[in-house]
């Protein structure tokens, strides 16, 4: 039985996918957030998507990601924490979060993922960034029958 809580997270431009290893479930919701007067969060995920283009002028429904990149750190943080709370009520002690990220990210973009993950209830979490091609290969089961070898090449640690 799995004791620790492990989550795989894909913050896509249009959808957020969260895999819970303990429950073996995938939560898939729209990556949208509804905000009143630019400060109060009203709805997140599919609830915000249902409000899209049907809201009064003081309520904005936005996508906090743009072209696979974080456009608004505070809004992505609100989306992530709300959807993780919907996924599981109790995160446990030091949950592990694996984020699927683009390969060509800058250090500033990488830092924004760390900023998002270490807020609120997740401040004691272990967080890892996994390149999208590697995450896709793992999801397809390509690496299941490969023995692990570690190569250190020019100061770069490569796991194969």
For each feature predicted by the language model, list its residue ranges.
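Nucleotide/phosphate-binding catalytic cleft detector across ATP-hydrolyzing
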Residues: 1-29, 34-42, 46-154, 158
